């Protein structure tokens, strides 16, 4: 179920504060964050976030098409190695 419109999008306060400081200074440094649950808002456009995937920080450059999504959607946590090909020679042995 989506979040109520009267509540507005959820963004961690510390993350919003870091973006506001960079917007005031006019800098675009990478912002390291563990907040995968934060919603991307229009203030984030043009910034690069290093989103934690459980092991390392994945750089995510925010564009206008990402607004409304969560930061965690762009940093996958699982690595898909592919399905094992059906090997008939190995089955005979």
Curated annotation (Swiss-Prot):
Keyword RNA-binding annotated: yes
Record bears the keyword Protease: no
Keywords: Ribonucleoprotein, Ribosomal protein, RNA-binding, rRNA-binding
Pfam families: Ribosomal_S19 (PF00203)
GO MF, one annotated term: rRNA binding
GO process annotations (BP): ribosomal small subunit assembly; translation
Biological role stated in the UniProt entry: Protein S19 forms a complex with S13 that binds strongly to the 16S ribosomal RNA.
Protein's name according to its UniProt entry: Small ribosomal subunit protein uS19
Organism: Rhodococcus erythropolis (strain PR4 / NBRC 100887)
């Amino acid at each position: 179920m989506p979040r109520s419109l009267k509540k507005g999008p959820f963004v961690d306060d510390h993350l919003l504060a870091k973006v506001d400081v960079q917007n005031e200074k006019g800098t675009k440094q990478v912002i390291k964050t563990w907040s995968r649950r934060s919603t991307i808002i229009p203030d984030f456009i043009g910034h690069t976030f290093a989103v934690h995937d459980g092991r390392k920080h994945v750089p995510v450059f925010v564009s206008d098409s990402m607004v409304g999504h969560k930061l965690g959607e762009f940093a996958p946590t699982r690595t898909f190695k592919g399905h094992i090909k059906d090997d008939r020679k190995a089955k005979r042995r």
